[in-house]
Amino acid sequence: MANAQIRSPSVAIIGAGMTGILMAIRLREAGISDITILEKAEKVGGTWRENTYPGVACDVPAHMYTYSFRANPQWSNRFAHGDEIQGYFEQVAREQGLSEQIRFNEALEQCHYRDGKWHLTTSKDAQLVVDFVVSATGILHHPAYPDIPGLESFGGDSWHTARWNHDVDLSGKRVGIIGTGSTACQVISEISETDCDLTVFQRTAQWVVSVPDKEYSEAEKTRLSRDPSRLALLRRRYAFVLRNTFSKAVTGSKLPHLLVSWLAKRNLRKNVRDPELRAKLTPDYPVGCKRLIISSRFYEAMQRDNVHLETTAINNISEQGVVTVDGITHELDVLILATGFKPFDFMRPMDLRGRDGVTIDEAWEKKVQAYRSICIPGFPNFFLMLGPNSPIGNYSVIAMSEVQTDYVLKLIDLWRSGELPTVEATEDAKQRYNAYLKAGMGKTVWVRGCQSWYLDADGDPAMWPYSWEQWVHEHEVPVLDDFVHQPPAEVEPLRPAA
């Protein structure tokens, strides 16, 4: 088709985190310049902007937690700290000149599809009309607060880890932390080294694998800077190890699961000396059923004299502290909630309405599902990045976003050339895709009896049950038959006379 016939779309990107930055860069490389990025906060960064708790770091090796086109030889640690990751995304955004296209401190409040376009209203009451909307709002960005009676009655300082209060000095304080997931383990490992008195309230023990957090010297950084091939090799090695150990261990490969299970159990047995404490820290579910924690510091932290593990269930929160079901009040000055996020909210509470005014809540009333994690029937030209059943878990989310971004660009190209009048997966394609996902879940570790944020309200894992290689392969070429080929009528069709 001649270039004169290629349509040039307007695109709105919601969020200037890792995926939003990536999408803007890729769109411009594809010759699409009419791009608006709406960011609710004052700067880019997403997860790494919002999570500033002590000890925050990525549990994926830093040299593979970068864009494929922008390596970073300057990481200080194998597991990069949050401030360095935030700095990396800010630097990439500057280098790419994205600041002029990002509208900071402006959230998207309404997103309605009508007359073949998306009509947007922002928190500043600005109006936009665009062809495509890309929701790059991320997965874990709506803090989940525990449903514990009396939570609001606590008389001391209290906050969620994603809303860390840096004005409060924990030194000399009686601190309680609810939760033992990945974030909690990082916080506990860090603040246990202060002179606070720390009580950890554990509902569920976690499996932990120890991987040393290597520090890179300036000489090593210089060598990596001068030799891009060495840097690329390091990235490939980390990716190979993760794909063939952790990723395969949770999706049904027997030998990788045996290896990872042995590593986790050996770590606990070797590094927790007290048999009573070790018993409390021993999970009652298979390794990998919940997100595996990567930490070389957690068990050491839990054995410090100023750290106390409380496994008795919480009854309520009082003004003085946490009251357990045995009637004991654990008096506290500070209460920290490491209780995770709401993983199924995605772009909500945005007022998102597709064709015929159908809301996203109505579309997802029975089940939060999408076609290939990205396309929602009834919401034409709308892409949900890192949606349900993306392969989230002990692998680089950046790699996932790059695969999805390339796939979205191929779909937009089909629209530009006129092969697809709109980009909208059919309901049948969505149902078949999710049946395919469900068929693969039986061999995964996520269905083996534990409760985790991976599971939806029906207890089904919102994960990818097959290999990483298979996921990449299935996003290489869009299946045209899975998409609507005739634009649905925007008005009620004429009916024959009686």
Task: Name these PLM-found stretches.
Residues 77-141:
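Feature captures the FAD/FMN-dependent oxidoreductase FAD-binding
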Residues 3-8, 12-13, 18, 22-29, ...:
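Rossmann-like dinucleotide-binding core of oxidoreductases
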Residues 49-58, 149-150, 297-299, 354-381, ...:
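FAD-binding beta-loop-beta segment adjacent to the flavin cofactor pocket
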Residues 9, 123-132, 325-334:
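Core beta-strand elements of the Rossmann-like FAD/NAD(P) dinucleotide-binding domain
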Residues 334, 338-415:
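Glycine/threonine-rich phosphate-binding loop and adjacent beta-strand/alpha-helix elements that clamp
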Residues 113, 130-132, 136-143, 181, ...:
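Glycine-/small-residue-rich beta->alpha transition segments that form the dinucleotide
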Residues 248-256, 260-320, 325-351, 434-498:
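C-terminal catalytic lobe of FAD-dependent flavoproteins
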Residues 3-13, 18-102, 202-203, 270-276:
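Beta1-alpha1 glycine-rich phosphate/pyrophosphate-binding loop at the start
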